[in-house]
């Protein structure tokens, strides 16, 4: 456990910094978290009886920073069973290293109502159970709440938020950890407060673009053999190609609507289980989608949803719903920020399909 914490601290220390002003502008925000688990299916209702609590430190500048945290789970002492009777051991504790962006929903003279968007990595001391299929997992959380100015150097912050940790179905079984939490923190500005960044002098101009993106990923199957997951769960390729219309309507916000052409190799596995002939086109899907993004410089946090218009086969993975969600982030490249790379989670009603690794471009 100590070695794992040391590893995360060393990673944080390697974040490249050069300018002296970087250190002068930093604030330090130690906090305490208290939360409860959120069941994701009927046979997991018992986890709502267990709490988790932890400590974290956020080190940041204007609207961004890093988070280093430790979480202890009271569920760690429980031996539990699934509805199939499989015996699983405790989850263990969690070490987190993450990047965050924040902003004001309302800003007054003495207080503000703020949001935080956090993503990074979690290292769990135990894994290979129904909840977590691997030790290293993705960390995603969101929170909202007031920040109260106590003095020129000190703030008090209260946040209520949602937290998720999983590996994106890369290794199964992997239902993931979901929870709601309350966070209380003090923010210290050792060198005083950073002056807010001034908006660009030139007037903002709204932009319309033709948007094209390609996202690849891989997954293990959720499709069961009878009532059980298969003993050997091979990996399958997933792909999402999007083409559509994108509009930058604010300095910080953009939306798009698109047609998604999808392909999943898992369909072949469904055909093999039923003894039905398979061809390449059985794995295709067509959907109409819409995404929204909030931008912080070159970084953008994205969320969206899509509705299926067509399936190449009636034999679909068992967790498929008529719609799916997508959440992730982009990093814009190029002088005019017309290109981007990103990572997205494709989700069917709380079940993560897979992680997409995306490259895209906004044309014209």
What would you call each of these model-derived segments?
Residues 1-29, 111, 148, 190, ...:
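Bacterial Sec-dependent N-terminal signal peptides
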Residues 30-38, 61, 70-74, 119-127, ...:
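Transmembrane beta-strands of outer-membrane beta-barrel pores
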Residues 33-54, 80-90, 220-242:
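Surface-exposed strand-loop-strand hairpins of Gram-negative outer-membrane beta-barrel proteins
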Residues 38-45, 76-83, 126-131, 168-175, ...:
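Outer-membrane beta-barrel translocator domains and adjoining extracellular loop/strand segments
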Residues 47-50, 89-92, 107-109, 169-177, ...:
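Solvent-exposed loop/turn segments connecting transmembrane beta-strands
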Residues 53-61, 97-103, 117-121, 142-148, ...:
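Residues on the lipid-exposed face of transmembrane beta-strands in outer-membrane beta-barrel proteins
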Residues 63-64, 109-111, 148-156, 192-195, ...:
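Repeated loop/turn-to-beta-strand initiation elements of outer-membrane beta-barrel proteins
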Residues 178-197, 352-364:
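Outer-membrane beta-barrel "beta-signal"
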């Amino acid at each position: 456990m100590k070695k794992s914490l040391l590893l995360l601290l060393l990673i944080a220390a390697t974040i490249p910094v050069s300018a002296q002003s970087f250190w002068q502008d930093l604030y330090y925000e130690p906090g305490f978290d208290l939360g409860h688990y959120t069941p994701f299916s009927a046979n997991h209702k018992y986890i709502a009886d267990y709490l988790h609590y932890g400590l974290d430190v956020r080190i940041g500048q204007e609207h961004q920073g890093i988070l280093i945290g430790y979480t202890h789970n009271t569920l760690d002492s429980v031996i539990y069973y699934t509805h199939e009777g499989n015996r699983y051991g405790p989850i263990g504790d969690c070490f987190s290293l993450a990047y965050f962006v924040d902003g004001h929903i309302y800003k007054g003279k003495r207080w503000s109502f703020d949001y935080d968007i956090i993503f990074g990595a979690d290292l769990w001391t135990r894994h290979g159970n129904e909840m977590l299929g691997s030790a290293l997992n993705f960390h995603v959380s969101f929170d909202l709440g007031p920040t109260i100015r106590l003095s020129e150097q000190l703030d008090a912050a209260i946040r209520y938020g949602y937290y998720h940790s999983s590996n994106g179905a890369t290794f199964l079984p992997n239902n993931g950890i979901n929870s709601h939490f309350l966070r209380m923190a003090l923010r210290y500005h050792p060198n005083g407060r950073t002056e807010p960044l001034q908006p660009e002098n030139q007037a903002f101009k709204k932009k319309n673009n033709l948007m094209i993106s390609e996202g690849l990923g891989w997954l293990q199957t959720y499709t069961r053999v009878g009532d059980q997951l298969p003993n050997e769960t091979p990996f399958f390729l997933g792909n999402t190609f999007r083409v559509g219309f994108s509009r930058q309507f604010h300095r910080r916000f953009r939306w798009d609507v698109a047609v998604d052409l999808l392909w999943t190799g898992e369909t072949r596995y469904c055909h093999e289980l039923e003894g039905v002939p398979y061809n390449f086109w059985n794995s295709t899907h067509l959907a109409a989608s819409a995404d929204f993004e909030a931008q912080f410089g070159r970084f953008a946090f994205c969320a969206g949803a899509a509705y299926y218009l067509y399936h190449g086969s009636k034999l679909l993975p068992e967790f498929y719903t008529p719609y799916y969600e997508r959440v992730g982030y982009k990093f814009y490249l190029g002088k005019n920020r017309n290109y981007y790379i990103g990572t997205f989670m494709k989700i069917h009603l709380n079940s993560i399909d897979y992680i997409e690794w995306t490259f895209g471009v906004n044309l014209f």
